[in-house]
């Protein structure tokens, strides 16, 4: 909004030229969302406590009984802070910004309804898996239909570390992209089981993808680093900045011991938009590296369920997802969280190195 209002005046006031720089607006978008979420956090937490929007703890995780009653739906705070900051600092005529917001709001709304059902019925289960999956596919599908209709966007796939490999998926690209978004959404949802466990890796992943998005939308950088150029995509880096800031602000209250949980409104929304950002900058496969922690958590569930059915009741892990396995082994929660953060940062750096190693 500020860009649309102030930048046209730069011919008369040269200081306003600063608004044309995506990097400047991304940084201030981050700062704005961070301040907004930290300032609103205490009031929001008290309001959730007053209306009794509290977390229902899974009955199998007995060591988490002390967390029962902690306010949930903190993802609303992330969503509100990042949306306000994005609208304030981004170019509101950019189609890619609006598509990103569509995915973020859509997936967050699915999570919101899921959380509300849990709270309303005082249980740990909301939507059925089929209903939730269908809703996610619909939101992702609508976004993809708009995205592939953009002339600058292609259905080719990029392979990390292999600059000359760009197979065209054609009609199969849209279902593939939907799979990426839905998969990322549910992977983050599975990871969100300990205080601060999911939000920090999400921040790391968003930061890495924001670099790729900025490069993808910059003619010179994309040519130098041999990344597919997509005009206008770089503006989404402003949204990424807002989401990082809102995430950091949420972590202020979600760090161990948590004062608030993000709920499905946070995990589904963040995961869905994480997948869309990867699709947007043509780094769908890189997401496997960027979000390696989410992949590991998801695989632990798949392996556990598959092995349980195959052997008629035996388990590989004490409990899945993976973070619960380590909890039941007696490792302190705070240590598990920090170690998982280290894993996330390490894979984030590996993903960044792929920019040059092409």
UniProtKB/Swiss-Prot annotation:
- Name the chemical reaction catalysed here: UDP-N-acetyl-alpha-D-muramoyl-L-alanyl-gamma-D-glutamyl-meso-2,6-diaminopimeloyl-D-alanyl-D-alanine + di-trans,octa-cis-undecaprenyl phosphate = di-trans,octa-cis-undecaprenyl diphospho-N-acetyl-alpha-D-muramoyl-L-alanyl-D-glutamyl-meso-2,6-diaminopimeloyl-D-alanyl-D-alanine + UMP
- What is the designated name of this protein? Phospho-N-acetylmuramoyl-pentapeptide-transferase
Which Pfam families does the UniProt entry name for this protein? Glycos_transf_4, MraY_sig1
One GO BP annotation of this record:
regulation of cell shape
Entry's localization field: Cell membrane
Alphabetical GO CC annotations of the entry are:
plasma membrane
Q: Which PROSITE patterns match?
A: MRAY_2 (PS01348)
EC number(s) on file: 2.7.8.13
Q: Name one GO molecular function term.
A: UDP-N-acetylmuramoyl-L-alanyl-D-glutamyl-meso-2,6-diaminopimelyl-D-alanyl-D-alanine:undecaprenyl-phosphate transferase activity
Disulfide topology: none
What organism, scientifically named, is this protein from? Lawsonia intracellularis (strain PHE/MN1-00)
Provide the alphabetized UniProt keywords: Cell cycle, Cell division, Cell membrane, Cell shape, Cell wall biogenesis/degradation, Magnesium, Membrane, Metal-binding, Peptidoglycan synthesis, Transferase, Transmembrane, Transmembrane helix
Enzyme class name: transferase
């Amino acid at each position: 909004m500020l860009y649309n209002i102030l930048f046209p005046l730069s011919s008369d006031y040269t200081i306003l030229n600063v608004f044309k720089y995506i990097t400047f607006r991304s940084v201030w978008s981050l700062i704005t969302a961070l301040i907004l979420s930290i300032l609103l956090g205490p009031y929001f937490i008290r309001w959730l406590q007053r209306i009794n929007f509290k977390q229902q703890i899974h009955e199998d995780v007995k060591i988490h009984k002390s967390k029962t009653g902690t306010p949930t739906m903190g993802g609303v705070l992330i969503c509100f802070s990042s949306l306000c900051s994005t609208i304030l600092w981004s170019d509101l005529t950019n189609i890619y910004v609006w598509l990103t917001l569509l995915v973020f709001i859509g997936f967050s709304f699915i999570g919101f309804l899921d959380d509300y059902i849990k709270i309303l019925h005082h249980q740990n289960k909301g939507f059925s898996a089929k209903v939730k999956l269908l809703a996610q596919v619909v939101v992702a599908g609508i976004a993809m239909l708009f995205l592939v209709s953009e002339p600058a966007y292609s259905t080719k796939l990029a392979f990390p570390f292999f600059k000359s490999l760009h197979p065209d998926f054609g009609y199969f690209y849209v279902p593939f992209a939907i799979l990426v978004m839905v998969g990322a959404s549910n992977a983050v949802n599975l990871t969100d089981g300990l205080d601060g466990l999911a939000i920090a890796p999400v921040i790391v992943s968003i930061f890495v993808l924001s670099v790729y998005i900025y490069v993808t939308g910059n003619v010179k950088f994309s040519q130098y680093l041999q990344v597919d150029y997509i005009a206008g995509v770089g503006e989404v880096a402003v949204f990424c900045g807002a989401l990082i800031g809102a995430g950091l602000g949420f972590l202020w209250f979600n760090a161990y011991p948590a004062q608030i949980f993000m709920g499905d409104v946070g995990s589904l929304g963040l995961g869905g938009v994480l997948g869309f950002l990867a699709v947007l900058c043509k780094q769908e496969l890189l997401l496997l590296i960027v979000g390696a922690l989410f992949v590991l958590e998801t695989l632990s569930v798949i392996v556990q369920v598959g092995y349980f059915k195959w052997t008629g009741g035996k388990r590989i892990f004490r409990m899945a997802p993976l973070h619960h396995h380590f909890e039941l082994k007696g490792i302190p929660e705070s240590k598990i969280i920090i170690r998982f953060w280290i894993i996330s940062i390490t894979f984030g750096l590996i993903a960044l190195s792929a920019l040059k190693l092409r």
